[in-house]
């Protein structure tokens, strides 16, 4: 579990609730999925200001004067929490920090997340001043996803490099740090062990949790043993073993599978199956669908080195799915994540695709939903602040027209999104 020194920023928006707007709203008659695994048929959720004040059965008393929202036949659950996403220097299928890592573009991305029901995003890397500023404004956000940031990803080879970079990023006051221990399938230089060990030590000395990007089981085990607080990607080279499982469960370290990240490395070799899906199109930037259908672009990709790597990641995806099922069965807490934000990893849409892929990997719809709500918040040390429908939590609500427990794709049947007690979409 990650616990950050800046958790008070996350709590601030809760304490401001009464002053902001004290309207009381009761959602009645719907199926309540509370983010912990509990279901209440025909339940009641009461919101006052920015926070939830009561959750219970139909008999739950409704305060006098409350506005009643009848959601019979619908499902209400917490806004989804992405434990590993990004706000990025991306526009369409282009990436350019100088042009695109701007406040207006980041706000647009956070609004896109929110339109798809993702109301909190932990951006794990490449975060700069505009991202930090938006994080600091979470208390007033009602039309975009809440944002937490890790700052620049820490790299290096020597202990001095790892320690210095960790200290430099920590001085920016991020919510956590992130290291990258990967060689991109032997095409890049991996972060040196002295550097990542020093970075972990420095993070903990500054009371900051640290997430680790890995690919190989050996690196996952080594960084976990050294104190990593979140395994931010799937192990993709081989089956996980008992020692790794024990390391995760003994320290209650969470594991973020990011299955759609692997999918994005090869799926554009042909036209992706969702390119004309209205649910995808509602968040797609102009021109993107046409580019994804462009045969010449696909042909150029298939002739590239990136495509060759994608074929290896395609095989890694199958390993990742099996490992996800194994880890969940063995009691490891799963932190829903997508690594969305870079080109081709579509914010909002990919989160729903990730849920579908998690269920295809063997999780139940409820297990996937808990990973994407209560457990995602818990894995970042923020239980009770958001991600669950409980007294005192942020009134971030996702209302669906149908039942996602019957078919996980029903998360796409979005009726409304509420953020901090206000209807946003």
Provide a role label for each language-model segment.
Residues 87-103, 155-160, 183-191, 304-312:
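Acidic/histidine-rich helix-loop elements
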Residues 32-44, 57-58, 318, 346, ...:
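Acidic, glycine-enriched loop/beta-strand segments at the rims
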Residues 136-152, 191-212, 252-257:
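Alpha-helix-loop-beta-strand connector modules within alpha/beta enzyme cores
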Residues 1-10:
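Bacterial N-terminal signal peptides that target proteins for export
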Residues 74-138, 218-230:
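Metal-associated gating/positioning segment near the N- to mid-region
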Residues 106-129, 144-153, 173-184, 209, ...:
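Divalent metal-dependent hydrolysis catalytic cores, especially in the metallo-beta-lactamase
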Residues 32, 36-77, 96:
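Histidine-rich, glycine-flanked metal-binding segment
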């Amino acid at each position: 579990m990650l616990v950050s020194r800046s958790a008070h920023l996350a709590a601030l928006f809760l304490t401001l609730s009464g002053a902001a707007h004290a309207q009381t709203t009761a959602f009645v008659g719907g199926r309540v999925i509370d983010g912990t695994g509990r279901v209440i048929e025909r339940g009641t959720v009461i919101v006052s200001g920015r926070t939830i004040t009561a959750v219970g059965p139909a008999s739950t008393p409704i305060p006098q004067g409350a506005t009643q929202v009848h959601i019979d036949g619908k499902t209400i659950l917490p806004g989804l929490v992405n434990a590993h996403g990004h706000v990025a220097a991306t526009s369409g299928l282009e990436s350019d920090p100088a042009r695109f890592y701007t406040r207006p573009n980041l706000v647009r991305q956070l609004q896109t997340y929110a339109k798809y029901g993702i109301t909190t995003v932990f951006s794990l890397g490449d975060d700069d001043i505009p991202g930090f500023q938006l994080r600091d404004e979470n208390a007033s956000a009602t039309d975009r996803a809440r944002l937490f940031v890790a700052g620049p990803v820490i790299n290096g080879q020597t202990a001095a490099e790892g320690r210095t970079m960790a200290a430099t990023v920590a001085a920016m006051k991020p919510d956590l740090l992130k290291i990258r221990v990967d060689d991109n399938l032997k095409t890049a230089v991996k972060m040196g062990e002295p550097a990542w060990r020093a970075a972990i030590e420095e993070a903990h000395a500054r009371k900051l949790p640290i997430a680790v990007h890995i690919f190989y089981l050996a690196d996952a085990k080594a960084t976990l043993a050294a104190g990593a607080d979140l395994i931010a990607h799937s192990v993709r080279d081989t089956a996980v073993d008992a020692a790794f499982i024990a390391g995760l469960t003994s320290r209650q370290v969470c594991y973020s599978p990011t299955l759609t990240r692997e999918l994005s490395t090869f799926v554009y070799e042909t036209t992706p199956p969702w390119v004309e899906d209205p649910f995808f199109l509602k968040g797609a930037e102009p021109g993107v669908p046409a580019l994804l259908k462009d045969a010449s672009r696909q042909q150029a990709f298939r002739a590239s080195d990136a495509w060759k790597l994608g074929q290896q990641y395609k095989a890694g995806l199958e390993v990742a799915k099996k490992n996800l099922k194994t880890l969940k069965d063995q009691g490891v807490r799963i932190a829903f994540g997508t690594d969305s934000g870079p080109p081709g990893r579509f914010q909002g849409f990919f989160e729903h695709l990730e849920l579908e892929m998690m269920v295809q990997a063997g999780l139940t719809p409820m297990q996937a939903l808990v990973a994407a709500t209560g457990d995602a918040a818990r894995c970042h040390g923020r239980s009770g602040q958001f991600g669950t429908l409980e007294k005192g939590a942020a009134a971030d609500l996702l209302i669906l027209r149908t039942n996602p427990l019957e078919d996980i794709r029903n998360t796409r049947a979005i009726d409304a999104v509420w953020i901090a007690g206000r209807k946003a979409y």
